[in-house]
Amino acid sequence: MSTADLRLRWAIALLLAAAGAAAEDTCDRNEFRCRDGKCIASKWVCDGSPECPDGSDESSETCMSVTCQSKEFSCGGRVSRCIPNSWRCDGQTDCENGSDEQGCAPKTCSQDEFRCQDGKCISQKFVCDQDQDCVDGSDEAHCQAATCGPAHFRCNSSACIPSLWACDGDDDCEDGSDEWPQNCGGRDTAAAWSSSPCSSLEFHCGSSECIHRSWVCDGSADCKDKSDEEHCVTATCRPDEFQCADGTCIHGSRQCDREYDCKDMSDELGCINVTQCDGPNKFKCHSGECIALDKVCDSMRDCRDWSDEPIKDCRTNECLDNNGGCSHVCKDLKIGYECLCPNGFQLVDQHRCEDIDECQEPDTCDQLCVNLEGSYKCECRAGFHMDPHTRVCKAVGSVAYLLFTNRHEVRKMTLDRSEYTSLIPNLKNVVALDTEVANNRIYWSDLSQGKIYSALMDQAPTLSYDTIISGDLQAPDGLAVDWIHGNIYWTDSVPGSVSVADTKGIRRRTLFQEKGSRPRDIVVDPVHGFMYWTDWGTPAKIKKGGLNGVDIYSLVTEDIQWPNGITLDIPSGRLYWVDSKLHSISSIDVNGGNRKTILEDEKQLAHPFSLAIYEDKVFWTDVINEAIFSANRLTGSDVNLVAENLLSPEDIVLFHNITQPRGVNWCERTALPNGGCQYLCLPAPQINPHSPKFTCACPDGMLLAKDMRSCLTEVAPVLTTQGTSTIRPEITAGAEGLPKHKEDQSASSTSRQPALSTVESVTMSHQVQGDRRNEERPQGVGVLSITLPIALVILLVFGAILLWRNWRLRNINSINFDNPVYQKTTEDELHICRSQDGYSYPSVSMPFCGREEAASKLKDRS
C-alpha cells in the first residue's frame, strides 16, 4: 500500500471522527442545547424551572430572546415569559412581575347587575336580600324594609317568599315563620311532615335530615340544628380512665400505647413517642445502652461490652479504600462509614445510589410527571398551560363558573367573584345539579316537587323549564350527566336505587337497587364507561359500576361513615369525596388504590355536602357554615372562603369545557340508529381492550330478546279454558317501531299484550312488575287446577294396580320342587290358574329350554 493511500485513509477516519463528535454536540430540532452540551426539550426553555445543570435554559440572556405567539401575552421584565391571552386581566396574577393584571379597565356591570365597592358585579336580586353577597357588604348598605307583593308571604325576618311555599310543611323562611301555626290558621304543618322517610334505624333531626341512630349523643353534632346532641347524658369516667372525644371511657394505660382504643382515635392524639438512641448524636451499644456519639472511640469504656471502642474500626477511614465501595458519596464515621446519595437518588444495597422515580407518587405534579435522572419535570395536558408564577396547570379557553344550589335558586359565580348572579330563581328545594357544557344546558332536581328539570343556560332565568323526569321520584339527591351518550343518571335514597334515562326523559331504567342502601351523590366517566356513587347506608361505602349497570362492586369500605358529595378529576384519574361524619376530604384512584386524606377539619368541614374540582383547587359546600370553601386539592392547604351567608348550599359543579372532554358515542357509530337497540343504548365499561362498546337495555320489568336488542315482556300463561281452546304463553315486543317477537303458537286462540309507545314506555316499565305480582295469584290457581287432577288420576291408577295384584295373588297356587340331589328348592314356580272349567296350566318359559322340552319336563314332574 502506497503512502498516498495511507494518508487518504487517515484523512477519512479523521473526518468521520470529527463528524461523530459534531453529531454528539448537536441537539435535535425540538431540543435546546445547554451550555454544558446537554440537550433538553425546547418547551422547557424559559418555563420558570431550570432543567439544564448550569441553568442556562432559564438565564436572562436566553429568555430575553423568546418571542411570544399571537395568542400569548409577554410578561416582559428581566425574564420574559409567555402566558395565554385569556389570562390577561382575569383577576389572578400569572406573571411574576404582575404585568398581566396591570392597566386593566374596570369591569363593567350589566343593567341587571349591582356593582360592589370593590368593583365586583353581583345580581341585582341579591341587593337588600339580607344576605351579604359583596365581600365589602355594600349590597346590604342603605336598605329599607322589604315590601312583599300580593303573591308573596312575608317572613318574620322581613324576607319575601312565594305564597305557595307557606304552610306546606317545609321551612322556607330562614326563621321557619312560614310554617308557624299562627301563620297557618292554627294548623301544625310540622306534624304532617313528621312522617319522614327515615327508617327505624335512623334518627329524624329537627331540621328534617335523617342520620344513623348510632350517631345520636356521640359528642359530634350531625344534624344541622344539632338536635342529635340535645338532652344527652354525658358519661363520667373514673380517675384512672381516659375519656375519648366521643364520651366513652377506656383504661388510662391505653392512652398513647400506639394502638387506637377509642373509636374516634382520640387516645393517640398529642402523644410523643420517643425511641431511644434516635438521632445523629446517639450511639446504641451492642449491650443495649444508649450513649452520646462523642463518647465513641474516646479510649474510655462507656458500653459494658466495649462496643464503643473497637480497636480495629476506631480511627480507620474506610472511605480511602475505593471510596468505601460507595457509588457516590462516602462519609467516614467514628466506627465504620456510610454511603450517601445526592438529591433525587436513594441508597440501595447499602452502597449503590439509584434514581428516585418521583412520578410514582400520585400528587408529585399537578397533572403530568416526567421522571429525569435525579429529578423530575411537571407538564400539563392538552387544554392546560403551566402558570409560570404558581407552577400550576391552568385551563385555557372559556371562563370557568361555579354553579351551586342555594335551596330556592341556582347561583352562578366566577372563581374571583367578579360576576355573581342568580341563574335559576324561584325554586322550591333544589338539591342536585349538573351540566352539559357542549349544549350549554343545566339539569337539576327539586326535592319538594319530586322532579328533574332542564333548561338552557342563557334562557335559565325565564320560566321555560323542561321537565325530564316527573314520576316515581322520592329523594333524587344525586344527579350526573353523561355528556357523550346523552343520558342522565340519578340516585334515590328512599328506595336505594340508581337509575338512568335519556336526556329527554323518554326512556328510563333502574340500574341498581338494594335494600338498606342509601345512595347519595353520583358521578360518571363516560369516556371509560364507569359511574361512581356514595352510599351512607349500613355499612357506608363508595360503589363503582358500568354505566350500563354491570360489574357493580364496593370500591371503598373502610374508614368511611357518612360519604356525601363525590366528584371525579378525569385528567388525574382520581375520585374525591367528603365525609360529613369524619369532617374530611379524601381521594383515591379509580381502581381503589393510593388513598389519601387531603383535609380534616371540624370547623371548615362541619357538614360538607358536595364538592367540585378545577385545576389545583377543590371547592365544597357546607350546610352548617352555610358557605363555600376552597383548598389545594393536593395538599389541603390554602383554605379560602369563596361565598358565605348562603341558605342551605348543597350541590356544586364547575362549568368549563375542560371538565367534560370529548369522547366517541359508539351508539351512533353503527349502521343502525341507537346502536340497533329498541330501547336504551348504554355505554359498557372499558375493563379491557376486548370489552364491548355498548349494550342494549330495556325498561324495568322487561327482558332482552335473543338478539340482545329487542325488549320482550312475558304474559302469564293460562293453559286451559272452557271448551277446547288453549292459550299458550306469548312474548311480545315492548317498544314502538320494532316488530313483535312471539314464541311458536299452535293454539287456536291467543291473548295479546299492547305494544309500548316510546312516550308510554317509561310508565309501562314500572307497571309491569306490579302486573306480574297481580298475576301471580291466578297463575298459582291455574297450576293447582292442573296438578291436582293429575295427582288424583295417578292415585286411582296406583290403587287399581294394587287391587289387581292382590286379587291375582289370591287366585294363584304356587308349587315349589325340592331337588333331592342338591337339597335345594328350585326357583322355578309353576302357577296353576283356576278357571271356570277347573285348572289350566299357563305356558312356562324356562332358561335354555325350548317349549317342547319345557312341556316334557312338566309331564315328568307331574
Swiss-Prot record:
One of its GO terms (molecular function) is hormone binding. The keyword Transmembrane applies. CDD domains: EGF_CA, LDLa. A motif (NPXY motif) lies at residues 817-822. Disulfide bonds join C27-C39, C34-C52, C46-C63, C68-C82, C75-C95, C89-C104, C109-C121, C116-C134, C128-C143, C148-C160, C155-C173, C167-C184, C198-C210, C205-C223, C217-C232, C237-C249, C244-C262, C256-C271, C277-C290, C285-C303, C297-C314, C319-C330, C326-C339, C341-C353, C359-C369, C365-C378, C380-C393, C667-C681, C677-C696, C698-C711. GO terms for biological process: cholesterol metabolic process; lipid transport; receptor-mediated endocytosis. The chain crosses the membrane at residues 783-804. Gene3D superfamilies: EGF-type module, Laminin, Low-density Lipoprotein Receptor, TolB, C-terminal domain. The modification Phosphothreonine is found at T724, T732. Glycans are attached at N97, N273, N657. Residues 721-765 are annotated as: Clustered O-linked oligosaccharides. Residues 805-862 are annotated as: Required for MYLIP-triggered down-regulation of LDLR. InterPro entries: 6-blade_b-propeller_TolB-like (IPR011042), EGF-like_Ca-bd_dom (IPR001881), EGF-like_dom (IPR000742), EGF-type_Asp/Asn_hydroxyl_site (IPR000152), EGF_Ca-bd_CS (IPR018097), Growth_fac_rcpt_cys_sf (IPR009030), LDL_receptor-like_sf (IPR036055), LDLR-related (IPR051221). Binds low density lipoprotein /LDL, the major cholesterol-carrying lipoprotein of plasma, and transports it into cells by endocytosis. In order to be internalized, the receptor-ligand complexes must first cluster into clathrin-coated pits. Forms a ternary complex with PGRMC1 and TMEM97 receptors which increases LDLR-mediated LDL internalization. This is Low-density lipoprotein receptor. It comes from Cricetulus griseus.
